[in-house]
Amino acid sequence: MFARLGVAILLVIFSANLSWANHVLFVVGPDSHGPGSHEPIAGARLLKHCIENLPKLTGHTAEVVSKWPNESQQAKADTVVFLGDTFPANRFEDAARNLADLHRMMQRGCGIVCLHYATGLKKEDVSPTGEHPLLGWMGGYFANPGSTHHVSYARVFDKAKITPGKAKHPILRGWKEFVIRDEPYGNNYFGPHDNKPAPNVTILATSLQPPESPKREAVAWCVQRADKGRGFGIVMPHYYKNWSHDDLRTFVLNGILWTANITLPQAGVKCPAPDLKSFGPKSVEAR
């Protein structure tokens, strides 16, 4: 009897450990920016390092690819994180196939994250009224200049103040309002109803911009989808060196792991400040 009980306890522990290990897939698309700006490959490597070396959330794994992921990589992912010049699924060869792959991933509850310019969609990517699957999967997007249904804007601000949203949400744990020199996109697109976010979308952070005509702009958001999947979009960082900012790094890591259905610590996801040079950027400083 006691032997059977012991085996049962071990099985429960083993099962719990299995369910605790989640996998994050980073997909890096094309990039045309100069050294120190965007640096999507280095940024993905840095985030992978953080996820695999978290002191209080152990066992999680991550992978970085710079081409469209194969079926095995897609199937393994609990969430997929995109970096690059606009939404990589539309930039890699055979966008229709890529979007179909993502549709299947989303249907099974996979998460999706886009960082900075990967939140962007071009005029040719969307319908004349702005329809695109990313709007439902992630809750909003950056409408690239040239779009006809809506136009977002990109501008570097020397002192952009990033203010946490008012909602109580796990992604808001462990970081506070901060000021940063970056390019937090404004007038992002959330849908055809006066650009108001859908009911299942939470605005996570805002920034009052531009200085000469301030308006509170949503710069990060998340969605809890009906398919049980989750999405997270944040329109920073433009500068690679900003990954050294503790509050920004916690904010982004919170968002990524939340979309992978990982329970976040009350103090947020804390990754010690990494050595930015070690992840192979063309430059740490923009030039």
Spans of model-derived segments:
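Boundary at the C-terminal end of the N-terminal hydrophobic targeting segment
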Residues: 19-21
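Helical hinge/lid and interdomain linker segments adjacent to catalytic or ligand-binding clefts
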Residues: 25-27, 31-122
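A glycine-rich, often tryptophan-bearing local segment used as a flexible ligand/cofactor-contacting loop or short
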Residues: 27, 87-174
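N-terminal secretory signal peptides that target proteins for export/translocation
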Residues: 1-3
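Bacterial N-terminal signal peptides
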Residues: 5-17
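Extracellular ligand-binding/catalytic regions of CAZymes and related secreted enzymes
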Residues: 28, 46-49, 75, 210-218, ...
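Active-site rim elements
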Residues: 32-33, 155-159, 176, 209, ...
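Catalytic beta-strand/loop cores that center a nucleophilic Ser/Cys/Thr
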Residues: 149-228
